[in-house]
Amino acid sequence: MASVSSFRDVIANMYYNELFDELSEYIEDNPDKLESNSYRVQSPDEAALSDFDIITIDITDSPGNSILFDVIVSAEVEIAETVRRNRETDGIEQWFRISCRADLDDGIQNFQIKSVSIYNKYRESKLGRLSEYLVPIIEKEQFDDVATEFLNEFCPEALSTPMPIPVDEVVKRMGLKVKEIQLTKHFTIFGQIVFGDCTIEYYDRNERTYKPLEVSRGTILVDPNVYFMRNVGCMNNTIIHECVHWYKHRKYHELVKTYNSDALLISCRVNETTKYKKQWTPEDWMEWHANGIAPRILMPRSMTIKKIEELIKKNELLFGTYDRLNIMENVVYELADFFQVSRIAAKIRMLDLGYKEVEGVYTYVDDHFISNYSFKADSLHKNQTYSISLSDSFFEYYATNRF
C-alpha cells in the first residue's frame, strides 16, 4: 500500500504561510499573554515570531463536508522588555492553539483561521474526533451508538419496531445506487464504494477477461456471487457495509485525493483480517468500523433484544424451557430469517448482546458447520471458545506450552 500523508502534513504544506501570518499578528498584539520563563525578560512588552513547528492537529468532525481542527504549534518567539531604561531581549518557546475550519470537497476548500490562543494542554477533548488521517476515532463500545445515529438519519422507523432493514430504501435515502457486477475473477472482492467518478475494471465471465467500466460517484458495486455463493443476508451486509464507508469515511478519501487523484474507491475483500497486525493502517481501521457497525445497523440493539425475547418465549412453548440447545438453534435461525442476515451474523449479534447459550449452535469451523453442543452458562469467559480451526490449533500447539 502506498504511504498515506497525514492531515498535519497536508496543512503544513498548503497553509504554512497563512498560519505564520496569523500567529505572528497574535504574538505582536499580545506580548503580555506569553508565558515567559526567561530570566532576562519577565514581562515582555514586545514580541515577534521567528518560526514554528506543527506538533499535532486536534480534528473534530462536523456535519456535511466541513471539519473543525486545532493546529497545535511550538513557536520560537523573540521577546523584549524595557527595564530601567535598558532594553532586554531573549528567545523563548511557546505553544499555541490555532483554531481553524475547512471544507473537504475535491480537496481542501474554504480554509479559515478562526482564532489563536495560548495552548492549554488540559483543555477537554471534543466529541466526534478524527484521526490524523481524518478517520473517525470510534471505539467498539460506540458501535451501537453509531448504528443508532445512522438509523435515526436514514431509517428511523427501524428504531421503534423490530423489522428487517429495507436496504434498497436506505441506499436511496442516502443518495447512493447499487450496481451488481463481477469485480474479480476469483471472487476476492465482494463490494466497493466509489467516492469519485472513475473507470474501474470488472471481470467479464463470458469473455474471461477484465474490461473497463465507467462508474459515477456514490455507486456501490456488489458482486452478485455474494448472493449465489452465500445468501441474501451476506448481500445485505455487504451493501450496508459500503454505506457505512460512505457515511463515515468520505473525509479520509477527500484528504487522500489532495495528493493522489486516483484514490477514488474502497474495496472490501473476502476474509480480510487485521487480527494479527501489530500496527493498523487507516484502511484497517475503516474496515474494522464497517465490519462492526453494519451488523448493528441491520440488527439494532433494542429492537433485536425485543425480537430475541419474543422468539425465546415462542420456542420455549414448543420445546419446553429446559431444551436450550434446540431453543437457541431455532432462535438463531428465525432471527436471521427475520432480519434478513446470515445465521452466523445473527449468532454473533446474540453473543454480543449477552446470550452466551448460542455459542454452541451454528458453529462454523474449517469451512463447515460442526455439531451443536451445550455447556454451563458460566463455564466460558469473554474471548473463550470450545471450538477452534485446525490452523489455529497448530499455531497454539507450537506457540503455547500449556496447549
Predicted regions and their residues:
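A metal-dependent hydrolase signature that marks the N-terminal structural subdomain at the beginning
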Residues: 1-197
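Post-HEXXH active-site segment of zinc metalloproteases
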Residues: 233-237, 249-281
